[in-house]
């Protein structure tokens, strides 16, 4: 498979995920964007959900949103989708970079953006053992 075919397949998976979210969530007033640039000339984030016209997710929206998203109070949700690889340090740093850039470009406070990684494969035990859940905000940190 050449690079162009790989790129096309990659984009199709992201468009498919975005379309699923769009079909489910647009009727309940959530804007869905795919291939969303986090800043001019940069790589594109995979999927962005933006809650519109209300302070919290409505019950109808919560019923359609997946675990890990429905309970957030953030009105912007950045989704990094890995259809063929598991979560690893590079994927984590990529998602965090997109998050940082999006916050800067949109001039948002961090609590307004929730970042999620969706992966088709379970992370390796070595990776998960190298990170631990800590603190009352349940943030992941690298084990020392």
Regions found by a protein language model. Give the residues of each.
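Elongated, amphipathic alpha-helical interaction scaffolds
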Residues: 1-144
């Amino acid at each position: 498979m050449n690079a162009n075919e790989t790129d096309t397949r990659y984009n199709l998976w992201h468009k498919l995920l975005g379309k699923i979210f769009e079909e489910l969530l647009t009727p309940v007033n959530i804007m869905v964007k795919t291939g969303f640039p986090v800043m001019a000339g940069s790589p594109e984030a995979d999927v962005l959900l933006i809650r519109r016209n209300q302070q919290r997710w409505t019950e109808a929206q919560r019923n359609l949103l997946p675990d890990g998203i429905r309970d957030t109070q953030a009105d912007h949700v950045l989704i990094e989708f890995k259809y063929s690889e598991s979560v690893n340090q590079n994927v984590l740093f990529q998602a965090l970079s997109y998050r940082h850039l999006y916050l800067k470009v949109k001039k948002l406070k961090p609590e307004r953006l929730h970042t999620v990684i969706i992966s088709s494969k379970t992370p390796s035990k070595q990776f998960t053992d190298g990170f631990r859940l800590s603190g009352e905000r349940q943030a992941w940190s690298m084990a020392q």
